[in-house]
Amino acid sequence: MGKKAIQFGGGNIGRGFVAEFLHKAGYEVVFVDVMDKMVEALQQNKSYKVTEVSEEGEHTTTITNYRAINSKTHESDVIQEIATADVVTCAVGPNILKFIAPVIAKGIDARTESKPVAVIACENAIGATDTLHGFIKQHTSQDRVESLYDRAQFANSAIDRIVPQQAPNSGLDVRIEKFYEWAVEKTPFGSVGHPDIPAIHWVDNLEPYIERKLFTVNTSHATTAYFGHFRGKKMIADALEDKEIRGLVHKVLEETASLIVAKHDISEEEQKEYVEKIVSRISNPYLEDNVDRVGRAPLRKLSRKERFIGPASQLAERGMKYDSLMDAVEMALRFQNVPGDDESAELANILQEQPAEDATTNLTGLEKEHPLYPAVLDRVRKVQQGTK
């Protein structure tokens, strides 16, 4: 029997990143989603195209050998598929992990295969597989938890690939940047060995990869979006052509770089080169990346372990500079009532309804005693008072 991977989430990252590399590694991919239209489209089309976009031009890969199941209506089928799968991946958004955990737990519990299934969450979040693992344990009966690791192994991953806004008529096809990084920790697999997926860079310690990526790629992308939105720019590439915005983004990245160099075994020179590469990537006009798309979901992006408060809190704890990150936080706080983005409306509501102290705690998860708290509180007050 051939290799089989279950991919939760049929969105652009699921189809255009994870499934592409699973397909290239020889896996049959079973997409699991709750969106009727997405599942039906995957069921009705036997192939779709992933087009890599770069300055050198375009390269298209046709993805085949996949199926799709609606977990809302066919949960028992999903359980059976997981029971005989080699790999389970997901790209659903960090907030959705708790909703997919119950069916994954049932699927793992139904396994009789001698080799455990590899579970890898592919989310823009630190320790996403650990989070999913925790939810799966909650949905596993107590007498089965101890033997859970005979049936499944859990490895965190760091993913990096920019997926711009897709054309409205693109269907299942995905346009995506050529560059990618997919790092996964190999230690959890022990003597069993990790799955054979050539696109994955298997590492002993994932934290440097995750933090470097989140605090460089995601921080710079969102910073560009929030400053760009504030200044009326429509596209990320246009925003970065504005010398002032580009300078502000570089100042933010100098601060996150100082943390990465201080904390991880990465030299100043190496991080500087990485920063230049990232700014060049997000400046790519061929990606046609929309400012409001990149800025959406500001509540998640302002949260405790995310791209702004995550590095700023660690810098504050180390007594290091974080002023430019606070400028970015202020711009994120000003990303309110953007059409099509529920979180930006909720952000506006929180800032309007709650006192500054409550809003600061609720938005960022920072304790009042934390050294970063006063600086964030100042920005919240400033935005609430409507001062520029």
From Swiss-Prot:
UniProt: NAD(+) binding residues: 5-16
Q: Which gene encodes it?
A: mpdA
- Asked if rRNA-binding is a keyword of the record, the answer is no
The job of this chain, per UniProt, is described as: Catalyzes the NAD(H)-dependent interconversion of D-fructose 6-phosphate and D-mannitol 1-phosphate in the metabolism of mannitol. Has a strong preference for NADH over NADPH.
GO annotation terms (biological process): cellular response to heat; cellular response to oxidative stress; mannitol biosynthetic process; mannitol catabolic process
What is the name attached to this protein's record?
Mannitol-1-phosphate 5-dehydrogenase
Question: EC number(s) on record?
Answer: 1.1.1.17
Q: Which NCBIfam families does its entry note?
A: PRK02318.1-3 (NF002647), PRK02318.2-5 (NF002652)
> Pfam families, alphabetically?
Mannitol_dh, Mannitol_dh_C
Q: Report the domain of life of the source organism.
A: Eukaryota
Q: Which organism is it from?
A: Aspergillus niger (strain ATCC MYA-4892 / CBS 513.88 / FGSC A1513)
Q: Which reaction does it catalyse?
A: D-mannitol 1-phosphate + NAD(+) = beta-D-fructose 6-phosphate + NADH + H(+)
Q: Which SUPFAM superfamilies match?
A: 6-phosphogluconate dehydrogenase C-terminal domain-like, NAD(P)-binding Rossmann-fold domains
| Subunit annotation | Monomer.
* Assigned protein family: Belongs to the mannitol dehydrogenase family.
Q: Which GO terms describe its molecular function?
A: mannitol-1-phosphate 5-dehydrogenase activity
Question: Does the keyword NAD belong to this entry?
Answer: yes
A single GO cellular-component term from the record reads: cytosol
Q: Which UniProt keywords apply?
A: NAD, Oxidoreductase
Active site (record annotation): 213
